[in-house]
């Protein structure tokens, strides 16, 4: 139907005035595609541009993905006041956790490749902490995939006040981390060079990067699950 653009722009403008910062985005894309970060400095013209761009984007997807829609979500700042944005990802397959990791950056919107030397200490600290808390959060993460009726995917979340704030379920593979490793070239080189010391602190990172063993375990689990459940 016809969109009342000016009315929607007003609603978005009010939302920003309450929350300070927000993402306006499509509901079913990954890798920061179809996403605008708006804040109190965003003019109504900029808000209108973002909204019209997303409406056009949704219309182009409707033939193949009818459920495509636009959502507005409050931007969640890092709780520590560290200036870092921390993001957690857990790979789930048939009710089992295969792997998990945390990434971090000073940027509001970032990809794995954006991590560098300045992020290294925090990257190690977050992943060490994630390894320690995994047994406590495991059931919640598995439940998040289950309620979406998905048996395969990467559950993404923030952690605030020791609570998980779920963001989305992503495809598991094809990203920079699964192809090349974590961070930029300098960070990858550091992780390789210091493997013997770091593997004791952040075994999850090296398990994920050991592709031959990782995929062997993955396919063995698929075979076992299908043999016993189907």
Regions found by a protein language model. Give the residues of each.
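C-terminal active-site "lid" helix and adjoining low-complexity regulatory extension at the edge
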Residues: 118, 128-132, 146, 150, ...
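Protein kinase-like catalytic core scaffold
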Residues: 22, 71, 86, 98-99, ...
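A conserved acidic, glycine/proline-rich C-terminal tail/linker
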Residues: 141-145
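Anionic group-transfer/hydrolysis microenvironments
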Residues: 27, 75-76, 91, 156-158, ...
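Short strand-connecting beta-turns/loops that link adjacent beta-strands
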Residues: 29, 95, 160-162
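Phosphate-binding site of ATP-dependent enzymes
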Residues: 33, 39-132, 136
